Amino acid sequence: MEKLSGLSHLLMTVFLYNFSTFMVIPAITDVTMSALCPGQNECSLAIYLTGIQQAIMGMGTLVMMPLIGNLSDTYGRKAMLTLPMILTIIPLAILAYSRTKNYYYAYYVLKTLTAMVCEGSVHCLALAYVADNVPESRRVSVFGILTGIGSSAFVCGNLSTRFLSPASTFQVSASVAVIATVYMRIFLPESINVVVENGVSTEANVRLLDEDKGSKKNVRIFKTMPSFDDTVCLLRSSLTFSQAAIVAFFTNLGDVGLHAALLYYLKASFHFNKNQFADLMVITGIAGTISQMLLMPMLATAVGEEKLLSIGLFFNCAHMILYSIAWSAWVPYAAAMFALLSVFSTPCLRSIASKQVGLSEQGKAQGCISGLGSFANVVSPLVFSPLTALFLSASPPFHFPGFSIACAGFALMIAFAQSIMIRAAPPIISSFKVGNGICVEP
């Protein structure tokens, strides 16, 4: 618990940041519909704009996640956390001021641009921060606790939305985002010094993506920019890492497809509003928090993270299928309870990936996994947004409003099948180095 207490400022930062971002999720659908299609329960324009936004964000994060991870290995986790946390404030402040059509479009553009840097980067850097300070034997448990803190912020954010007006929701969200940034800058210690000063063995700290030691300081940033060949080399360095990357892609593909369609599907099928959305998310968040904070640390030791990953993906797939065939308004609430087990997948996947690289490569590894997951953010809207709009329209090919969600569940089924093939392997110290984009034996 001593090392975990040393991470308390990180956990508080993650809680505040996630609280500010999650609390607007139930309200944003109503705000979007009111701005674009006032008085309607179905809006194809809103669905397509959401899909375009996700695709652009995915293309941006596909490039930015590996870059941010690489730079954090050199310049520190705290320094790189500052940028996305500041950028998050800007679009929230716009809707805090006004939610009319013109302001919504301003929010839409700025949210799309800033999310290229912000989306997933705080979580990615937080995982690398944990890996800097926690030994491998306890890493999956602490990853679970970190994700559980995010889930508790999810619950608190959605509960607060339940009792706030849309205007107050965005005002509180923007204020908490500012507090999170200030708190992080004042209290969070830098972790990269821990890796350097603890005197870890040279062998355990060998970099998979080697940088030119003779580079001048003023061009060092360009040496840390990842190329496509660097990513390929990192994937080739470990079969387990490449399998984890495949699982990450299909998991993100399904999750993005679900989140893009679910709220519009529930609004069209059962006339849900922000209060029902908040209730549903609170159930999901409470189940996830209990599971990650209490069940996961015990099960990770008893079962192993590879099996726990498969269990999480199986129940994630099952709850998507149940959403897609919901025949009554109570069914989505029952499906939300599957989060009790489906939340295992993300921390287990990240822990498996983190054990395949040395301490000085944690930013690169987490950035690579996040970047490949972001590629799914590009593909998913191209597939699921047209399907969602088509099957929620007045003239679908056949009556199956949740068809796009069922297809998202199929993507999770592929991830589940791949996860079964992952076997526990000893951590990889170094298999390859990269020099000028070429993989060579050390």
What are these regions (language model features)?
Residues A27-I47, A260-F277:
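Short amphipathic helix-loop junctions that connect adjacent transmembrane helices
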Residues T61, R138-R162, A177, L372-V383:
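Glycine-rich segments within core transmembrane alpha-helices of 12-TM secondary carriers
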Residues A177-P189, Y323, A406-P442:
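Multi-pass alpha-helical transporter architecture, strongest
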Residues F15, P91, N102-S121, W330-T346:
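Hydrophobic core of transmembrane alpha-helices in multi-pass small-molecule transporters
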Residues M1-L7, E190-V247, N252, A268-S269, ...:
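Juxtamembrane intracellular "pre-TM" segments in multi-pass secondary transporters
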Residues Y108-G150:
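Cytoplasmic helix-loop-helix junction between adjacent transmembrane helices
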Residues R162-A177, P386-L412:
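A membrane-interface helix-boundary motif in multi-pass transporters
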Residues T82, I86-N102, F314-W327:
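C-terminal ends and interior cores of transmembrane alpha-helices
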